[in-house]
A protein has these predicted regions:
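Extended basic (Lys/Arg/His-rich) segments that typically form rRNA-contacting surfaces
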Residues: 1-315
Length: 315
């Protein structure tokens, strides 16, 4: 006999299940603590996963002082540059000044006819953010840069000083992250049109069932005379915008100082040419997918107290 009651299929945490609007998600920067100084975000490109050797220095850990092997994700993080500076008041941009018109942007947008000088006399603002773009042409991924809005931590004076220090200069990953935790925003792998078994995890019906095995037994009652949104149906799976909180940074380095490239390069990616970032665990998206790294929104003590020394990639 069938069961009359069972939990609904699929989580309402992620709804509607449709394709992401843009490949690089935006951020609600008001939720980030402004106590942290400097830029609060950076753009990285997923290289792939690897097994890494770590020395566990976490207090009260069963493997403290020992070498362990775990999975990690490698990201290539080419430097960024500032395109424009936005002055916010009451949560709305009050003024925007374009300060960069490099040749890297010719395929992305119409470059400004001339660069503007940063108006230091403009005082009627509450917050400064910048529109930054990645110098992805230095990598083997593509040539067209990615643009995003990045907030700056600290007081108004400290934010303005940070912008002045990096006008027409490259921003390396080491200026934004050093160690600790990081939140990662990105779009997952796209699976296309999938049935309800793969999309919602429903069970197969009896093999002699009529009108199909990999489908729901009933799509709802007679009345209301419509199919409810909660009924598992076929549709889009993957290519969803997702956030992974509190990822542990294991290593930040430069290829010129420490080469971690395999002999034939990373599968589906190639060789890293610029700086790289190694994060413990897995991250969303396929190889070459752009990801937005931000300072942690809600750091936890459990993740923050974990300490590891990076030894190298496992052979």
């Amino acid at each position: 006999m069938p069961r009359h009651h069972q939990p609904r299929r699929g989580s309402l945490q992620f709804w509607p299940r449709k394709r992401a609007k843009k490949i690089l998600p935006s951020v609600n920067w008001q939720a980030v603590s402004k106590d942290k100084k400097g830029f609060l975000g950076f753009i990285g490109y997923k290289v792939g996963m690897a097994s890494v050797v770590l020395k566990d220095n976490t207090e009260h850990s069963m493997t403290k002082g020992q070498k362990i092997i775990t999975s990690a994700t490698v990201l290539e993080c080419p430097p960024m540059k500032i395109l424009s500076v936005r002055f916010y008041k009451n949560g709305i941009p009050a003024k925007e000044v374009f300060v960069g018109a490099d040749k890297e942007l010719k395929n992305k947008l119409k470059p400004a006819k001339k660069k503007e000088k940063l108006d230091l006399d403009f005082k009627d603002y509450e917050e400064i953010r910048v529109i930054a773009y990645s110098l992805v042409s230095k990598t083997s991924v593509k040539k067209c840069p990615d643009l995003t809005e990045i907030a700056i931590g600290g007081s108004k004076e400290e934010q303005l000083e940070t912008v002045k220090n990096f006008l027409n200069k490259e921003i390396p990953i080491g200026e934004v992250f050093r160690e600790g935790l990081v939140d990662v925003r990105g779009v997952t792998k796209g699976k296309g049109l999938c049935g309800p078994v793969k999309r919602f995890g429903i069970s197969h019906r009896f093999h002699k069932s009529e009108k199909g095995v990999k489908k729901v037994g009933s799509i709802g009652p007679w009345h209301p005379a419509r199919v409810m949104f909660s009924v598992p149906m076929a549709g889009q799976l993957g290519f969803f915008s997702r956030i992974i909180y509190n990822n542990k940074i294991l290593e930040i380095g430069k290829i010129g100082e420490k080469d971690i490239n395999p002999g034939r390069g990373f599968e589906h990616y190639g060789k890293i040419n610029t700086e790289y970032l190694i994060i413990k665990g897995s991250l969303q998206g396929p190889a070459k997918r752009q990801l937005l790294l931000t300072k942690p929104f809600r750091p936890t003590k459990k993740q923050a107290k974990k300490k590891f020394d990076f030894v190298g990639l496992a052979k």
